[in-house]
From Swiss-Prot:
UniProt record similarity statement: Belongs to the 'phage' integrase family. XerS subfamily.
Domain Core-binding (CB): 16-121
Biological process, per Gene Ontology: cell division; chromosome segregation; DNA recombination
Cysteine disulfide links: none
Localization of this protein: Cytoplasm
A GO CC annotation given for this chain: cytoplasm
Name under which the protein is recorded: Tyrosine recombinase XerS
Gene (UniProt): xerS
Species of the source: Streptococcus equi subsp. zooepidemicus (strain H70)
GO MF annotation list: DNA binding; tyrosine-based site-specific recombinase activity
Activity regulation remarks: FtsK is required for recombination.
Length: 356
């Protein structure tokens, strides 16, 4: 979703929310939570409050009037009834006969509610320095996570990684071959953003930064002499991330055309720009997702920017055999998250041995 549209949607949801949700929104914006995350959470709150009113658990006539005491006194059975409602209600997709929503969606809903309840019962302060209330019913609600071994996850994901020579082959494909498959009109559009697109893909493959971190990069955050980028990690922590040397020519090529191509002025501090109605704007996450999907599908298989992050992590572990180094590169506090890459690399080594 385009940033302007996203912010418009957020304002629409804020206009119907209770005051304490607006407090929550302001607090999380300062962390900072991404606008995308806050938008998804506001959608979940709307669905939850509508259910409270429809189920007569709140006497409010509208969402904005659902009071704190309603949330404070909800029982574990009430929350379980809401989960059952999610599981069994007709799908909102007109073309689907499936009932309910996926477990992933339910988990996202519960995550949003858990975040709100934690804020109301632990983080916020009233005029006496105390939370609004203390009873957190969400701590009693169990979530069901998708069960999948690391080996199974590694098997599913490795086909969507550009390992070995495929990393450079993918960049070369976008640089030299992709446009030959396009119409003349499509070629013009491709050439307009070619340097930028290659710079984005190269940076993701060479650093493993998250999509949101790439979107939020400013010019001051990129040091091509040191091959470092400064990013804001989850939780609002700033971090310096090393970038592999192969990305440098692509980043330099983009910077050489950035000002003239996108009509960038001094106030346009975003590193990656897009032109909208002739004006420079920070590129948004959905545009990068579509761009990466388009190029990767033409090359081999459609992947997301997050798979490019996995690609970097797997290649780095394959070279160093250090989970600590990989976890630092990705911005993880623990090496547990990097266990996946050991399984992928071990599978690749086994496949190589089988070919001897």
């Amino acid at each position: 979703m385009k940033r302007d549209l996203l912010l418009t949607k957020i304002e629409e949801y804020k206009n119907i929310m209770p005051w304490y949700v607006l407090d929550y929104y302001q607090s999380k914006l300062s962390v900072p939570y991404s606008f995308t995350t806050l938008y998804e959470y506001l959608k979940e709150y709307k669905r939850f409050f509508e259910w409270l009113i429809d189920s007569d658990l709140s006497k409010a006539a509208r969402i904005a009037d659902v009071d704190l005491t309603t949330l404070e006194h909800l029982s574990k059975k009430d929350m379980e009834a809401f989960i059952l409602y999610l599981r069994e209600r007709p799908s909102l997709n007109t073309y689907s006969t499936k009932k309910g929503v996926s477990q992933t969606t339910i988990n996202r809903t519960l995550s949003a509610l858990s975040s709100l309840y934690k804020y109301l019962t632990e983080e916020v302060e009233n005029e006496h320095g105390e939370p609004y209330f203390y009873r957190n019913v969400m701590k009693k609600v169990a979530t069901k996570k998708k069960r999948e071994t690391l080996a199974a996850r590694a098997e599913n994901i490795k086909q969507k990684l550009f390992l070995g020579d495929e990393t450079m082959a993918f960049l070369d494909y976008v640089d030299k071959e992709y446009e030959h498959k396009l119409s003349n009109r499509a070629k013009a559009s491709f050439r307009k953003n070619k340097e930028r697109d290659l710079a984005i893909i190269a940076l993701l493959l060479a650093s493993g930064i998250r999509l949101s971190e790439a979107v939020n990069l400013d010019l001051k955050d990129v040091n091509l002499n040191m091959m470092l980028v400064e990013v804001t990690r989850k939780g609002g922590k700033r971090d310096s991330v090393n970038v592999a040397a192969f990305a440098k020519p692509h980043l330099e090529a983009y910077l050489s055309v950035r000002k003239d191509r996108y009509q960038a002025e001094k106030q346009d501090v975003a590193f990656f720009l897009t032109a909208y109605r002739g004006l420079p704007n920070r590129i948004d996450a959905s545009s990068i997702e579509k761009m990466v999907g388009k190029y990767s599908e033409s090359f081999k298989i459609r992947v997301t920017p997050h798979k490019l992050r996995h690609t970097l992590a797997t290649r780095l572990y394959d070279t160093t055999k250090s989970q600590v180094l990989v976890s630092h590169q990705l911005g993880h506090a623990s090496t547990q998250v990097t266990d996946l890459y050991t399984h992928i690399v071990n599978d690749e080594q086994k496949n190589a041995l089988d070919k001897l």
